[in-house]
Amino acid sequence: MTAPADESNAHETVPLQNGSDLKEKRNGSSPYHMLSTYLSFPTREQEQWWSQTGPVLGRMLEASGYALDQQFQYLTLHYNQIVPRLGPYPPNFRSNLTVSGLLIEFSINYQQKGTNHPTVRLGVEPTDSFSGTERDPLNKVPLRAALNQFERIGVKGFDSQLYTYFEPKHALTREEQLRVATEIPGGDKRSTQGALAFNLEDSGINMKGYTYPGIKAHLAHVEVRSMITEAIKDLKSQGKGDWVEAWAKTADYVTEINGWGFHNLWGWDYVDPSLSRFKFYTWQFDVPDMTKLGELFTLNNRATSPTHLEGLTYLHKLWDIIDLKGSGKRELPADASQPPENTNPMLLSYEIKSGNPLPYAKVYFPLQGFNDLACVEKIARFWEHLGWKGLAESYPATVQSFFPNHDLSKTSHLVYWLSFSYSEKQGVYSSVYYHANAEI
């Protein structure tokens, strides 16, 4: 087991630019403002989505060290491919993708190895004016239309085979959609069938897909485990890849912790199936201590490679710093589920790759409802522990610059999640998830 890195041996990422640098750029000619001067919009709603989310994305790209041409490239992607798929403004369809119900979220990923700067990411549930109506009650049509468009424009490496495979297995039929409200607890709030995510990398976009198999399984009177196990074995029989052993370990442990349910999320990469990861998400309502978290991270000793154990040392430090139990009561919207004080609810995902018998865990600390500045300062402490001194020093001011009209010391809805995973290739792999439109 290797001890956590200190400043002398840590892998230093490119630090975020500080808030004052960004303010100067915004007062001048930032890519967002230069584009906005000449862009036209077919509807007022698209213009509003652009004016509310575009500046946040632009600031994140600047702060994360993207070259100027890349900033223009990804803002143009946002204008052309994301904004037209966000539907009415303000939105009238609530997504299960985000805590706020917003159809879009931004995140920034940091890793010890393998990248020159942090990576900005987008998550989105495509929608339109028919979403949530009797014409498309659970918003199935816009996702399919979005994928068709990305296939047409020739995104490098894009492959929709896994969507074509999983969509009919996990998405609800018309008849099943009509049964959700009466047969699923809280069914009127379980509206999302699928979502997209984009990593904005130097080499281009890397796309990921998500579905919610739990509702389909319940309505079809089958278990989530058997539904996914059958699919994994079928893909192997087709010669698409072999995830069988890693999935069996994952499924056994999820059964052990009673982690099957409506909340389960399933994810893949939009690449050739043999190259894709699969991700399975589950939820624990209270993780009382680091011993339990260590069990979750290693699937109760089903995955204890040197890499897993090294990651566990970093996770232990992060647990101590974030201290969910000692953070008090969350300030959440009245209609949101309020976790009891002094509990540690956690989201987890288990990632499996073809040919690798071991799953790898990712832990998500839910920060929504806690003071944003306090959360950001805790995250900065973890960056400092990793030896990312420049990033740690600039981080609070930079996050404040993402939301210039809000005082982080007085808000509790702008920072959603902090995730942590660890691999031999990337080292610490951690992402912070943010509200994409602080005005909603």
Model-derived features with residue positions:
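PEST-like, low-complexity acidic/proline-rich intrinsically disordered segments
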Residues: 1-13
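Detector for Asparagine
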Residues: 9, 18, 27, 80, ...
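Long, solvent-exposed N-terminal ectodomains/accessory regions
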Residues: 12-125
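Residue-identity detector for glutamine
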Residues: 17, 46-48, 52, 70-73, ...
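Intrinsically disordered, low-complexity, compositionally biased regions/tails
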Residues: 58, 69, 158-161, 271, ...
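Helix N-terminus capping/helix-initiation residues
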Residues: 64-68, 154, 159, 289, ...
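Fungal eukaryote-biased detector of long internal structured cores
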Residues: 85-278, 282-286
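Compact beta-rich and alpha/beta scaffold cores in large eukaryotic transport/transcription complexes
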Residues: 142, 151-152, 220-440
